[in-house]
């Protein structure tokens, strides 16, 4: 049994596809009810006024309006939707 792999073979060459996380609607943008605002793993950003949170922590608009990102104290952020 060879203790070296044959020439040309490699243990590299794999990479998984990205998960398309992040901000989908930015501050000041108009959204409709149900529009996804932010996709995340865990609550990097918390839901504020008129924003729902899915079981995978996706934040989505509950009403039609304008997106606004705000601070929750020193180290937390929230996103709200206000009627336009």
Curated annotation (Swiss-Prot):
<comment type="similarity">
    <text>Belongs to the bacterial ribosomal protein bL27 family.</text>
</comment>
<keyword id="KW-0687">Ribonucleoprotein</keyword>
<dbReference type="GO" id="GO:0006412">
    <property type="term" value="P:translation"/>
</dbReference>
<keyword id="KW-0689">Ribosomal protein</keyword>
<feature type="region of interest" description="Disordered">
    <location>
        <begin position="1"/>
        <end position="21"/>
    </location>
</feature>
<dbReference type="InterPro" id="IPR018261">
    <property type="entry name" value="Ribosomal_bL27_CS"/>
</dbReference>
<dbReference type="GO" id="GO:0003735">
    <property type="term" value="F:structural constituent of ribosome"/>
</dbReference>
<dbReference type="GO" id="GO:0022625">
    <property type="term" value="C:cytosolic large ribosomal subunit"/>
</dbReference>
<dbReference type="Pfam" id="PF01016">
    <property type="entry name" value="Ribosomal_L27"/>
</dbReference>
<dbReference type="InterPro" id="IPR001684">
    <property type="entry name" value="Ribosomal_bL27"/>
</dbReference>
<protein>
    <recommendedName>
        <fullName>Large ribosomal subunit protein bL27</fullName>
    </recommendedName>
</protein>
């Amino acid at each position: 049994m060879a203790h070296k792999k044959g020439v040309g073979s490699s243990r590299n060459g794999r990479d998984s596809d990205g998960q398309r996380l992040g901000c989908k609607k930015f501050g000041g943008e108009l959204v409709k009810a149900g529009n996804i605002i932010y996709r995340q793993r865990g609550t990097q950003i918390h839901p504020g006024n008129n924003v729902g949170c899915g079981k995978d922590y996706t934040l989505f608009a509950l009403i039609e309006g304008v997106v606004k990102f705000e601070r929750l104290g020193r180290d937390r952020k929230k996103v709200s939707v206000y009627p336009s």
